[in-house]
């Protein structure tokens, strides 16, 4: 009898775990370090309209408590910034979606910050962290999920941390910022880079009826079933558990929201209706697509070959993911490394089919002799100065 009881209990526990994992796996917005620090710097933000733009200017200092920085997962010190964003005042849906990542959902370096919160702190869902770390085994086709418990970026309780520049930014639900949000009304919390508003998860059950009840809106993403296709050396293997962005898939109708984690509806600020994005507590938390055209002010810097100097994460893959420089100002890969990563047929140059991300986007500009291939010489001429110097040293 005891054996039967134990067996039944085990089946029950497995069933509960399977249901939980099926939605989020290792993804979590409640795993950050405690926020006990009150900053000496004061929040300073102004949001004004000018012509056909909405201007957000701030010092990027949050108006709430934060975690301790530096910390074991994030060695950077939070400091004031000079941030200025021009946001479309009258946004329109584009003919196609734009991913926040350079090569599509969960692939490549970050291409755009998603938006800015009303307190002037930027919203940036993705991180430049990949399978294989930053060495020659780096595989940018598999971006590590910043909010996975398998990836330690030193996030605080607001799912935020600090970049090497000192800029504090959110990767997911900013708990301290939204702690006073009402559960019985819609609350706008920011603006997306394409100009559409961002709300926290509470919305009307009927998106076109402001008299309908307020409910918790949910995303339409879930974990994929089965195992990843990689061999564990050049690409990840193992079950889809939320460690990578591509461990998730969009299932239309699974939740209330579309693939961009938004929907069209009435809001208190837009009584005639608007498309709006939603920050959810389940994946993806911050949206990963734009339905409109994002402002260039939100493009992630670093030039044609750059990545904005993001910090290496410590993750469960050991040295593959450990930051390579003590000061954490990680450099983009050299020209030679880029050629090696993209040159799949090993002919020493990159074809238009082999090119990825910003190089693919600017292929015609880099291909100076217009022969349909990018050589090391052509790529070096297009690279930022610091990359040229490092390429010659290697």
Cite the ranges covered by each PLM segment:
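Amphipathic regulatory helices of Ca2+-sensor modules
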Residues: 338-339, 349-361, 376-387
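Solvent-exposed N-terminal domain segments of exported/luminal and surface proteins
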Residues: 21-154, 158
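Boundary of Sec targeting at the N-terminus
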Residues: 19-21, 394
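Short, recurring structural edge motifs at helix starts
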Residues: 73, 153-160, 258-265, 348-349
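Extracellular/lumenal glycan-associated surfaces
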Residues: 117-121, 164-178, 270-284
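Acidic carboxylate motifs that coordinate Ca2+ or other divalent cations, activating on Asp/Glu
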Residues: 343-347, 367-371
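Sec-dependent N-terminal signal peptides
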Residues: 5-14
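Extended, compositionally biased non-globular segments
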Residues: 194-196, 201, 205-303
């Amino acid at each position: 009898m005891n054996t039967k009881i134990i067996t039944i209990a085990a089946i029950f526990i497995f069933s509960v775990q399977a249901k939980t994992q099926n939605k989020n796996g290792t993804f979590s917005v409640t795993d950050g370090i405690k926020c006990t620090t009150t900053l000496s710097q004061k929040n300073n933000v102004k949001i004004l309209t000018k012509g056909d733009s909405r201007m957000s200017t701030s010092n990027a200092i949050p108006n709430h408590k934060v975690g301790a920085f530096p910390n074991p997962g994030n060695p950077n010190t939070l400091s004031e910034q000079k941030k200025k964003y021009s946001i479309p005042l009258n946004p329109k849906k584009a003919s196609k979606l734009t991913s926040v990542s350079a090569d599509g959902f969960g692939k490549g370096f970050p291409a755009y910050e998603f938006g800015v919160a009303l307190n002037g702190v930027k919203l940036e869902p993705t991180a430049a962290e990949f399978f294989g770390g930053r060495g020659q085994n780096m595989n940018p086709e598999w971006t590590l999920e910043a909010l996975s418990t398998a990836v330690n970026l030193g996030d605080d309780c607001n799912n935020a941390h600090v970049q090497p520049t000192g800029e504090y930014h959110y990767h997911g639900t900013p708990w301290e910022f939204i702690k006073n949000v009402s559960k019985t009304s819609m609350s706008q919390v920011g603006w997306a880079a394409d100009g559409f508003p961002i709300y926290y998860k509470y919305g009307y059950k009927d998106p076109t009826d402001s008299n309908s009840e307020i409910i918790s809106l949910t995303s339409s993403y879930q974990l994929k079933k089965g195992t990843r296709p990689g061999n564990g050396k050049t690409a990840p293997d193992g079950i889809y558990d939320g460690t990578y962005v591509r461990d998730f898939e969009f299932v239309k109708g699974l939740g209330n929201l579309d693939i961009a984690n938004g929907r069209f509806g009435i809001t208190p600020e837009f009584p005639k209706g608007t498309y709006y994005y939603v920050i959810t507590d389940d994946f993806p938390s911050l949206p990963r697509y734009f339905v409109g055209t994002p402002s260039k002010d939100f493009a992630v810097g670093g030039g044609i070959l750059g990545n904005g100097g993001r910090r290496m994460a410590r993750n469960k893959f050991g040295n593959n993911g450990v930051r390579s420089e003590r000061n954490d100002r990680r450099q983009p890969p050299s020209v030679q490394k880029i050629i090696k990563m993209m040159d799949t047929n090993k002919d020493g140059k990159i074809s238009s089919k082999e090119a990825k991300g910003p190089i693919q986007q600017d292929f015609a500009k880099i291909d100076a002799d217009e022969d349909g291939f990018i050589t090391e010489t052509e790529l070096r001429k297009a690279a930022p100065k610091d990359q040229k110097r490092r390429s010659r040293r290697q």
